[in-house]
Amino acid sequence: MRLSEYASTRKTRGSYKMPRSVQQSIPIDRIYADGVWQSENVFSLMWQISDINYAMQSDAAKQNILTQLGTVYAGIPADCWMQVCIVSQRMDEKAFARDVLYHRENDGFDALRAERNRQIKANARENGNVVQHKYIIVSTNKPGVKEARERFVQVQGHLLSAFSALECAVTPLDNRARLEVLHKFFRISEEGRFNFDFDNCAKLGQDFRDSIAPDCIRFCKKHIEIEDFYAKCMTISEYPQQLDDKFISALLQQVPYIVLSIDIEPVETEDAFKEIDNAQMKTDAEKVRFNKKSVENLDFTSSVPQRTQEQDRIIANIRKEMTENDQQMFLSLLTVTYFADTLEDLALETDALKTTAANYNCRFTELYFQQERAFNTAMPYGLRRIESVRTMLTKSLTALVPFNTQEILTPGGICYGRNAVTGNLIIGLRTSLVNGNAMVVATSGGGKSMFVKLEILMLYLRFTKARFYVVDPENEYAPLVQELGGEVVNISVDSATHFNPLDFKYDKATKIPPHVAKAEFVLSLCEQIMGKEHILAGDKSLIDDALENIYKPLMASHYTAPCPTIKDLWMALNNQRDKRSKEIALALRIFATGSMQAFAQPTNVDMSNRLICFNIQSLGEQLKPVAMLSMLEYINTAVMSNERNDPKAATWVYFDEIYLLLRDSLSANFLYTSWKRFRKYNAYATGITQNVQDCLTNDTAYAMLANSEFVVMLRQTKDIDSVVELYGLSEPQRKYLLLAQPGEGIIKMGNSLIPFNNPQPKDTKTYKLLTTKPGEME
């Protein structure tokens, strides 16, 4: 088959009838329950693919990605063609207000919410906050839907395999998802009103196109009118010999509402070589004619025209690439459809796209009187109705890179700043991850305290039922905690604030009695005081008996009586007749009635407050092991009694300078257990450290780092190589961390690695609450 037959739209155009209604202008005749669409003799199926970090990769890594992308295209069956469709549009204003901005709660903190909203809106206005989705549509001319489905099963297997090598997720789309993509462009001002149910549609005999069709659509000479909006289609008609891989991302940045489609049709190898041979024969014939004419004119000095020589060189190069480098021939077509509110805006967007294309030595052609055909080619139908295709080899085709960088936009999440590559907002929510525990790592002055305090503030303002516990070794969090009405618990020998580690809240779900719940803590406490080597086998039974005795009044009162204290435990052990009990009591006495009785007092601070900060800056070395253990026990009790079924009522625990806790085996064990168990109790732990190397050499810390799905890497210097190795960062990402200013870095959220920046205006109340710089704090 000749290339002219491949280029023909007879097999790729689908249903081609004169529309008598707006619905009929949508060229889909039938949709099947499994998501297969039919347009006359064309069947299509659609998948969504995730973006990957291409822009921040090294040159070698980029080349590997392009090679693998070539594998994707090479796997297209000969009886199919592919459409790579990138849909780029601004977030809907209503969805933005609903899912990103803070809402009034009338709790005294609405002024802070309003200030955060102003900052988020300013960032969104500056960068547009464009949302991109990428799709693959594969079409075929099989004689029936059964044969088409069989082919799509094979294609899907290939796509899953090939894209998995790129760490790119592939998700098949059902009818509702496919129609919703179209709805966003046919009804631009009604993005949140899409409603479609396949079963009801089939049962009631309704036209599925009614759910997406606009009220009116008009195809003009060089633009399209869709209700009160305007659209225009263009196609690339000229390419350079070597295309820059930034071309696609550059085009998408010019227009806020755009559909960019790349139609790809494989040419069978036999047909490709026939075309090469025919082209070579024409070139050879041209050279013969020229030489013959030169002889006739007695001109023996002239050489073959440069154009013919160039054509000869191109043909030879194509033959070499296909025979020696396994390159495949494709027919490709790049089409864009973009939208605007006015014709003036549409003209400005046209100029912007043409200028950008010219900067990359490409040329856009305005398709006069072909807007309808171009529109139906660009939209994700899997149809091609434009014949001006371009012959490309695999290497050239993969330069049309659909990837740029990963984005995070989780509805109801909090704003972590802006993507350093695209400028889009990073809206994430740790509760959406499989394991939402986090680590924040940075050198001193890298901005880790400000990042963490800002996250606490944003979560506190967003989720009014959430609870927060902060372990603060440097007394940095008190201003923020006090501003939010939280409790600062100062832990030291002479502190006036006390909390009782034997406090207990009965959990109806587990029904664990208090003496059982506290047995492990008290045994660990005795190990800290007496030394683990001095604990005997029977000590646990003695401690268990004493705990059961002191908790009897609490249980008898149905958990309304005051909880016992360590002093009560000391008395219970001392009153037992067993000599060993009295030895344990003697070891406990200094913490029960002696000079270190800080944890033997009833709780005298409001531990029901949903924001509690444990200030351990003044903690002495002798009291530190017991204090740490008591504090962690209190946090553990709070987590265990948490509301488990409501993500908005999660418990958030922050450990600043976590390496201090990792030095003690019992504290380290608590952290290790927390990183594994907290998720079950609707709780999320966060570790903050500047000593990455210490964490990497500690098995417990290494496991925590490796198993945290949310990691914030701010500026790194001496530990940069360790961080790069642990998270597999590219050379550009490494340089970004080395040169990062305070508040800049890389966020790892699940499988996404996103460079970010999060500047905070200094003239805001939020900044004054977060900063630790002298002279800037309130």
Please provide the spans of the model-predicted regions.
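Extended, folded cores of ATP/NTP-driven motor/assembly subunits in large transport
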Residues: R2-F403
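Conserved lysine of the Walker
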Residues: K448
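A short helix-turn-beta junction within AAA+ P-loop NTPase domains corresponding to the substrate/partner-engaging
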Residues: G485-V489, T700-M713
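Conserved P-loop NTPase
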Residues: S730-E778
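Post-Walker A helix-loop "phosphate-sensing" segment adjacent to the P-loop in P-loop NTPases
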Residues: M458-Y469, A638
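P-loop NTPase motor domains
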Residues: I52, D59-A78, Q89, A250-L252, ...
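Hydrophobic positions on the alpha1 helix immediately C-terminal to the Walker A/P-loop
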Residues: F451
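Hydrophobic anchor at the beta1->P-loop junction of P-loop NTPases
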Residues: V440
